[in-house]
Amino acid sequence: MPVRPDLQQLEKCIDDALRKNDFKPLLALLQIDICEDVKIKCSKQFLRKLDDLICRELNKKDIQTVSSILISIGRCSKNIFILGQAGLQTMIKQGLVQKMVSWFENSKEIILNQQQSKDEAVMNMIEDLFDLLMVIYDISDEGKNQVLESFIPQICALVIDSRVNFCIQQEALKKMNLMLDRIPQDANKILSNQEMLTLMSNMGERILDVGDYELQVGIVEALCRMTTEKRRQELAYEWFSMDFIANAFKEIKDCEFETDCRIFLNLVNGILGDKRRVYTFPCLSAFLGKYELQIPSDEKLEEFWIDFNLGSHTLSFYIAGDEEDHQWEAVTVPEEKVQMYNIEVRESKKLLTLTLKNIVKISKKEGKELLFYFDESLEITNVTKKVFGGNKYKEFTRKQGISVAKTSIHVLFDASGSQILVPESQPSPVKENLIHLKEKSDIQKKLVNPLELGNSSSQDEITTPSRKKMSEASMIVPDTDRYTVRSPILLINTSTPRRSREPLQAINSVEKAVSKTSESGMDYAASPKSRQSDGRKRWNNRANHNKTTAVIQNKQYEDNESPDQNFNEIEDTLSNVSSAVGKVDKPVLPGVLDISKNTTHSRWACWTPVTTIKLCNNQRSRALPGDTCTQDTGVNKKCTKQKSVSDDDSEETQKGKYSKDVIKCNKSDEAEFCERNIQEQNHPKYSQKKNTANAKKSDWHIESETTYKSVLLNKTTEESLIYKKTCVLSKDVNTTICDKSPSRKSKRNHTKSRKELMSELTSCELEEIPVRENSKGKRFTGASESLINQISRRYNPSDSMMSTRKLKEPQDGSGFSKKPDLQFNKVQRKSYRKLKATVVNVTSECPLDDVYNFSLNGADEPVIKLGIQEFQATTREASMDNSLKLVKNHDEHDPFLKTKDKRMLSYEKKTLLSDTETECGCDDSKTDISWLKEPKTKRLMDYSRNKNTTKYKSRKSRSSMEKGQPRPTMVLNKNSMKNDYEVVVDGRTRLPRRATKTKKNYKDLSTSESESESEKECSYLFKDKLPTKEETIHSRAQTKKLPEKQQKVFNSEALKGQPSEEQKNSSRLREGREDSLCLSSASVSRSSSSVEVMRCTEKITERDFTQDYDYITKSLSPYPKAPSPEFLNGNNSVVGRGQSPRISETSAMCVRKSYSPASGPPFSPRHTPTKNNSVVNMKKANSVINNQRTQHCNSYSDVSSNSSEKLYMEPESPESCDNHMQNKREGNHAASPLSLSSEKIEKMWFDMPSENTHVSGPSQRGSKRRMYLEDDELSNSNEAEVEEAEEREHLLSKKRCQWENSDQHTFKTSLSTPDFSVPKDWQQELQGAGMFYDNISSDYKRKTDSQHKIMDDFTTKTLKLTQQHLMAMTSQAQGRRDENVEKFQVTLLDELEKVEKDSQTLRDLEKELVDIEEKLVQKMRAYHRCERERFRVLKTSLDKSFLVYNSVYEESVFTSEMCLMKANMKMLQDKLLKEMHEEEVLNIRRGLQSLFKAHEGNDA
């Protein structure tokens, strides 16, 4: 416990606070109870010290300290004495009131700085100041006069100032009215001066706009108290400009003040109309919980008035007080005390319910809810919202998600909290689209009929901007500013009439609802009317249906890659995609920041599987907290789902609609340009960009519209594709950086880097898009030009790279076509994986003359950028482009497949899953050629999320393969297989195939399904031998951000798997192989660390996508219908020879995907060897045997991709491990130059990779394959191998290319279907296998050795570098420690010196204490002596004065007095007796006389 300070030390406490800034004694003084009889003595300087202290603290704005000082003075004021006189009176004479005026003025400055903010500390300080003022006011008449004269004007000025908080003004008015109530008679003259008259007039004006009823009452009361009733009649007209108000004021009587004041103020507030700040409504009844509140008992009070104070944001009313003295009790409910309020109608009464945050007590009644019943006709809703805010309104509390409905509906809240339902395309301002919740439910009902909704809901309730109708009928409404702007825009997803999508899960208002697209491709939600909101920044040309939606972020439009993306694919596909893009672009809403891409998405989204969309939506909802772009993506994905559902049936219809919306382009590269141009035309800005792009280069890789759409879907899953390039650049750019680094190293990778750059540029463009259309258009143009330049640079490999890749240049284009598909598939997976940003760029530099001839489109390699992790997806885009080309050619060969392929291609473009699904596989020859030509281009595929991306992409690849009609991606993969080098380089795109193999059913991935099935078959065959490669691929899928070199290596490996066309172009393939080998070695080294991840991913992906892609292929892909039946029948189903090329293509795509950089990074060392083996196989693909082996490798890669996906999806099973071991053994035995059996050949292939591999590649590959097979074909592994051998022989006899494809199928089929047969001729085709094997083995060994050297060098340098850093770190740390020790030593010495000084001080004090002690002892002795002498004198005096003498004297006196008293008493006794005797004698005499007289009378 602290020492209790003496109350006499008040002045000392003030001194300590003033001089030492020590307030502890003063604060301790506040804890002491002060008795009334205690006197606190202070000096004359006390007031000066007090004033200095308070002024200093006020200048410092130390509110708490000032409040403590005022409380201390107030408590001790009556006990302070200065020079023996009352302290307060003395201080008043010294000028205390004047000093308090200065305190008040300083306090007012603080109050004005606070303005209307409510600061409890300031309010407490003002209250303490007024309390002290009232003490002074009551102390004496002099104090009253000074206070009235000094403070009444100050308080009036405070009340007039509108900047002061209402609570402070109310407190000041209360104190002033108390003063005026006890004003002396002679003080009225103080209130009669001109200054006060002016202030009173201003106070009268203040009544009109004060905004608080209590304050109004206080002002009226002050005016009445400051003037007499007679004078009030005169001044009323000066105070109020309107006569009827002045007359009403004059009617106020002091005896009826409360009721008269109510009448007056109701009149004043009512006259102001809408400008009034206080709304007063009569209340029928009021309750606090279950207790009813009574109206004050006053005859003149007719109503129970409730005041809604807009100025102070409070609700106030008066009730009957419990005590008889107080008939009126004021109750005020501030806004901060209200947790929620609700207004509803009950029994023809309007009930206002206020739910308070804490339990309150009113008139001894407690409760937490205040209930007010009003007449139903009173409009209190708006007023209540103005007082308590719209956010606390129970009915309109912001919802975290949208109610479930067939169509996604966004419920947005405007600033007032009102709900608004807005269709996706709705551009109208927030205020214009207010819709009640009931209307929301109605709209949801209307969504069942999209047409009706588009016509009625969009037009009647909400003015929707005119926008291009999309065959998908998907509307994308980017609402990135939804929360920031609180735009009441509700995205209405129109559901297709054919397939009503099950209710969407609740989507956060931040999330963008995905509009469902009808199979017919109609955008029902879009209304023909276009409406531009000036409040919201929109494109001026929104009315133009061809415009693409742009994402406005931070009031800036960001360029979307989709508008810029241009498909090199089939004309129909282009037209479909472009139309879809154009339509989707229109839906941009004024409040939406992020999506110009949405337009492209809608169609892509339609291609996206329904399951995928849901996943994207959910993921997106989680990722959406900040990204509206993600919302838009979600919308696109939903559309994609719808479209994918109706993919097979309405594909053609949608395509036709797209073509209607978008100008159709030729099948040539110009078609791609046209498509992009159409997209640009759809959006003026895009049109500008298109023109620039076309002028710059007709062959520059344009982002595929479809690809972009699928990217948007992916973006929906994560976050918006171009959310200020925060998402895209953060992940995609990072991926791009990873990819770019390899691309810079090799021009081959240059394509991938270019694609990445395209995605980056696109994201940048999206960010940079100005809010205004003109600026945005310019930026689109600039962005498109830059993209074109970047793409052209990437497609133009360096001279050194050109030597090896020029031959493959056309193949590279097709390789990119394949890549895009793979990337596209990956993109969809990424969307499942919640990819934050996905950019899909599809570019083609070579014509699309031959579906399988990528040489035609070698330069036109579609680039698909998956912005989630990297723009490596760009490589896939290239693959996609090639695949699209292949599909186109294949469609030419097979009209049915062509039509479906086109639809699927458009879908694939949108979905990014259709790359492998395109039916280019029909033309084996073309596929072979395209594969051979395309391999040069490296695929930029980014799988930011390995697991999801891998699954999803693999799924698509498999589906396309199974169908035997690989989608553009499939074709690209085939071509890549044939173009061993480049396609394998694009192997990253293979990763989606692995994912396709995984057993996830994505209905929209129909194309992917066929591819994935084909991949499965091939992967099964190769799985035993190439599991390692699959793992490698899968690991890449996980890593997703492999450098371009690795990606190229994988792509080249995949291309190796395509021997038929490679045999034709053996020389070019060899060159490509060399390049790919170099890349593969690099990628192997890099990806080796991620092998285990790949395995898990493979497993998981394999399972999920194996199941899902089949389902998806059946449901969505029209292509799979022809070849898919075989694939769809089961992974074990046998694929026909005609389908074998497709299968091989699919396998190739799978291989690409497996080799995709995304899968590459996760590779473990064993995966790396597989990768190298693939590369070696690619190199040897130049020869027929090489081509065949390359085909096997491709099949293996497909299998490996699938198995890698499987590994990713599920842990390796013992069976898979066993199969793997068997495969390794078989592969090792198969190392023999030629083998009569297909099994032996496969073994040779795998053995060769194993030899080239650092680790036993064949066994590793086999294990991967086994992993993939373990679900479907572990039991049939031997039969599968036999069948594989047979099928290989048969396919080789038919056609090496077809044979390779069939081999892939055979592998896959053998794994999946033991009943597949292979021709006996097959062995004859492999006569050159030994030579091919030797070449591959030597090349691979050389590469392996070089890699080992590089790794050794890297290890040595790393060790040295690490040692250097460790030494530097150690030295720095030691130096730091030494410095700290020295500092500590210095500090320690200083403290020791101080200790010595303190010790000396203590010794001196001790001496002083000894001296003092001696003096005290002497003084005490002297005192004792004096005391003893005093006692002696007193005793002597006492003895002399009393004792014997007194007793004797008193005894004599007593005796004499007693004798005298006795004598006197005897004399008195004698006298009395004598008188008594005489009286008796007299009485007897009288009696005798009367007796004698009576006797004498009788006798007479």
From Swiss-Prot:
<keyword id="KW-0175">Coiled coil</keyword>
<feature type="modified residue" description="Phosphoserine">
    <location>
        <position position="1183"/>
    </location>
</feature>
<feature type="modified residue" description="Phosphothreonine">
    <location>
        <position position="608"/>
    </location>
</feature>
<keyword id="KW-0597">Phosphoprotein</keyword>
<comment type="function">
    <text>Major component of the axial/lateral elements of synaptonemal complexes (SCS) during meiotic prophase. Plays a role in the assembly of synaptonemal complexes. Required for normal meiotic chromosome synapsis during oocyte and spermatocyte development and for normal male and female fertility. Required for insertion of SYCP3 into synaptonemal complexes. May be involved in the organization of chromatin by temporarily binding to DNA scaffold attachment regions. Requires SYCP3, but not SYCP1, in order to be incorporated into the axial/lateral elements.</text>
</comment>
<dbReference type="GO" id="GO:0043066">
    <property type="term" value="P:negative regulation of apoptotic process"/>
</dbReference>
<feature type="modified residue" description="Phosphoserine">
    <location>
        <position position="650"/>
    </location>
</feature>
<dbReference type="GO" id="GO:0000795">
    <property type="term" value="C:synaptonemal complex"/>
</dbReference>
<feature type="modified residue" description="Phosphoserine">
    <location>
        <position position="1232"/>
    </location>
</feature>
<feature type="modified residue" description="Phosphoserine">
    <location>
        <position position="1156"/>
    </location>
</feature>
<dbReference type="GO" id="GO:0005654">
    <property type="term" value="C:nucleoplasm"/>
</dbReference>
<feature type="region of interest" description="Disordered">
    <location>
        <begin position="1208"/>
        <end position="1234"/>
    </location>
</feature>
<feature type="modified residue" description="Phosphoserine">
    <location>
        <position position="1277"/>
    </location>
</feature>
<feature type="modified residue" description="Phosphothreonine">
    <location>
        <position position="1168"/>
    </location>
</feature>
<feature type="modified residue" description="Phosphothreonine">
    <location>
        <position position="464"/>
    </location>
</feature>
<dbReference type="Pfam" id="PF18581">
    <property type="entry name" value="SYCP2_ARLD"/>
</dbReference>
<feature type="compositionally biased region" description="Basic and acidic residues">
    <location>
        <begin position="1059"/>
        <end position="1076"/>
    </location>
</feature>
<dbReference type="InterPro" id="IPR040560">
    <property type="entry name" value="SYCP2_SLD"/>
</dbReference>
<keyword id="KW-0131">Cell cycle</keyword>
<feature type="region of interest" description="Disordered">
    <location>
        <begin position="1029"/>
        <end position="1084"/>
    </location>
</feature>
<dbReference type="GO" id="GO:0048808">
    <property type="term" value="P:male genitalia morphogenesis"/>
</dbReference>
<keyword id="KW-0158">Chromosome</keyword>
<feature type="modified residue" description="Phosphoserine">
    <location>
        <position position="1124"/>
    </location>
</feature>
<feature type="coiled-coil region">
    <location>
        <begin position="1388"/>
        <end position="1429"/>
    </location>
</feature>
<feature type="modified residue" description="Phosphoserine">
    <location>
        <position position="1213"/>
    </location>
</feature>
<feature type="modified residue" description="Phosphoserine">
    <location>
        <position position="646"/>
    </location>
</feature>
<feature type="compositionally biased region" description="Basic and acidic residues">
    <location>
        <begin position="1217"/>
        <end position="1228"/>
    </location>
</feature>
<feature type="modified residue" description="Phosphoserine">
    <location>
        <position position="1117"/>
    </location>
</feature>
<feature type="modified residue" description="Phosphoserine">
    <location>
        <position position="509"/>
    </location>
</feature>
<feature type="modified residue" description="Phosphoserine">
    <location>
        <position position="1159"/>
    </location>
</feature>
<feature type="modified residue" description="Phosphoserine">
    <location>
        <position position="914"/>
    </location>
</feature>
<feature type="region of interest" description="Disordered">
    <location>
        <begin position="512"/>
        <end position="548"/>
    </location>
</feature>
<dbReference type="GO" id="GO:0009566">
    <property type="term" value="P:fertilization"/>
</dbReference>
<dbReference type="GO" id="GO:0006915">
    <property type="term" value="P:apoptotic process"/>
</dbReference>
<feature type="modified residue" description="Phosphoserine">
    <location>
        <position position="1115"/>
    </location>
</feature>
<dbReference type="GO" id="GO:0051301">
    <property type="term" value="P:cell division"/>
</dbReference>
<feature type="modified residue" description="Phosphothreonine">
    <location>
        <position position="633"/>
    </location>
</feature>
<feature type="modified residue" description="Phosphoserine">
    <location>
        <position position="1140"/>
    </location>
</feature>
<dbReference type="GO" id="GO:0009887">
    <property type="term" value="P:animal organ morphogenesis"/>
</dbReference>
<feature type="modified residue" description="Phosphoserine">
    <location>
        <position position="487"/>
    </location>
</feature>
<feature type="modified residue" description="Phosphoserine">
    <location>
        <position position="1144"/>
    </location>
</feature>
<dbReference type="GO" id="GO:0051093">
    <property type="term" value="P:negative regulation of developmental process"/>
</dbReference>
